[in-house]
C-alpha cells in the first residue's frame, strides 16, 4: 500500500515547521506517545516534535494507523484507546448531524450497507444565505486522531483513497457547498477559509495530531486543484495552515490542558549561580508540572480563549454527534 502521508513532498515539506507549532505554548507540539522510545536515541513522551527529529525517521514512521504494523496498533490501542473508525461509520454519524441541521435525511448521500451513494444534485437550503450559515456552523471532533470525521482523504480502516466527490467528512461537505455556491476564485477562497475556521478537533498524541493537520492541508490543495486547476499560492497556504494549527490542537481532553503540563525550556543560558557547590546535596525536582489550559480561536469574534472557558459557558462550538458516540458528553 502506498504512503498516505509524506513529510518530504509538497505541500507538507514547505509547511512542516508551521504544522508542528502549538499556539498555546508558542513552542512545538510534543510526541505524547512512547512508541518511539526504542529508537537509537530514545524519544520521550514530553519531547517536542521538530523538523530535525522527523528528518531522522524513515518515511514509513509517521503514517496513519492503518499503515502501522499490528504490534504498534495494539500498543496504541492499549495505551490510548486508539481505534479505527471506518468511513461508512463516519458518514453515518455525520449524516445524523446534518439531518438535525437541515431537518431532512439524505442531504449529501444515501447510506448503503457499509457504504453510501452520493446525491449529485445541488444541496438545497431554505433561505438564500442558508449555505453561508451551514459553512459557518461550528463543529468539533473530540479526540480526533487523524480527523476522519472532519476530512476523508482515505478510509481510516482500509487506507483506500477516496475521490473528492465520494468524500464524507464534515469539512468535505462544507467545501462541496462552497463549490456549488461560489462563482470566482476570490469568493471561493473566502468561504473555503471560513469553512476551515468552523471545524475544530483536539488530540493527545502528537503524531496523530500532525497527521490530522496534514490531512486538512492536503484536502485544501485537492479541492483547489479540482475546482480551479492550480496549486495554492504561498499566501493562501499560510492562511489555511494558520487556521489548521489553531483549530486542531494538542490537549488532554480530561483536564483541558496541554499533555504533561508546561513544557520545559529547550535551552537555558547558565550563570555562575546555576552550578552546584561541591559539598551541597543536589535538590530533587519535585515540582508538579504547571497546568496550562489550551487556547483556541473564535474567528468570528477575532479573539482567542481557553477551551475550558468555552466549555463552561460560551456556546462557540457545536459538539457533533460523532463526539458523543465516542464517550464524551
Residues covered by each model-derived region:
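Short linear, low-complexity motifs centered on an aromatic residue
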Residues: 107-108, 262-268
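C-terminal tail/extension regions appended to the core domain(s) of diverse proteins
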Residues: 293, 301-304, 308-316
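Conserved S-adenosyl-L-methionine
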Residues: 92, 101-257
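Basic, amphipathic N-terminal segments
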Residues: 265-291, 296-297, 304
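Intrinsic-disorder/low-complexity loop/linker signature
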Residues: 26, 159, 175, 180, ...
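Residue-level detector of conserved catalytic or cofactor/ligand-binding positions
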Residues: 314-328
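Intrinsically disordered, low-complexity, charge-dense segments enriched in Lys/Arg
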Residues: 246, 260-262, 272
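Preference for the N-terminal adenyl/adenosyl cofactor-binding alpha/beta module
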Residues: 1-151, 207, 254
